[in-house]
């Protein structure tokens, strides 16, 4: 890890970001396949594929909540560990990781119990209809059992990335994705298990990835070791991690709340086809967003380490390169979606009527993702430098202050009420990006100035 530390602190930033970001981008693309491969196979189940796809789509809010709880711990814990490494405090970094591991086990047990007891009620609340509840219930009953594997794979995997081992993180995702792609057709079509087979394939794949992550963190190659003596939850170390991770948690968990609002409104105005289209829109949005998030995750160790080491010039250069990279990608993917919406919709279903409906909705829903690279770059930088308040504010404004009310306002302003619901997304995104850019410009300068002053004080003592 001494080589990794030297690399994070001294290597040319362009080459360093490329080295760290490529594996994380690949991992995010693989993760995207991992998340949507079930839907692709399910959408092609003979006879009732469209209803099955809609049913699994209703499960997505719950799955988002499970992932959000992993992010609550890891997205704050991993940057805090990186900052501690930058300060030379490796003991605290290992205690942070151990405490986060214990918290994830506790959260996994609670989530599993809640899902097994109230699964059907939650699915009905999240937009399942009498036509889709059977498929949704079958999927979630099995998926809930594998909650612990999801928590540990996502949560502890972040600590691998935080150390600069982005290739290992990529392998973690690759193992799970390949396993899922192989197991899905076997269970869905070979054993004729349908959506139950898709869920079983997913949790078995997550279990394999989980074993890989834990073996690495307990092994010789990991600089930060997962040790039994560090499993005690030290509030002074772990609670600041939760505060920092709250922004990511709000972003991800709010997706489930937003999904409920979208699904209920779409069911009201457009019926099952509108909800089915929303499942596809969410999948395409993941395709658009995950590579940007991968670039940002590749930048996180560089930003956190150098901020901890009070090397503000490298922090500024890394942010600028991150911003340019995210914006370039967001413009490219926006252009592809605008030009070929039918192609993206056709990946998920052979139903021509659903493809035609989705293609129109897709151009609306993804209308301003061309500038969303600004949002991703600013938010990841807030998290990477430990600015919990601003990262939380940005998350709350976009989801709760803007998008949530707009889901109900826009249908009243547009003649086609179904398309009005979809329009809420681009309107909210445009306002949110503007707000984030202004807030970041002010707060980033303050953070760098404060770090520079602290560095001068230390050098004069």
Task: Outline where the language-model segments fall.
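Short alpha-helical transmembrane segments in multi-pass integral membrane proteins
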Residues: 1-21, 81-148, 190-245, 303-368, ...
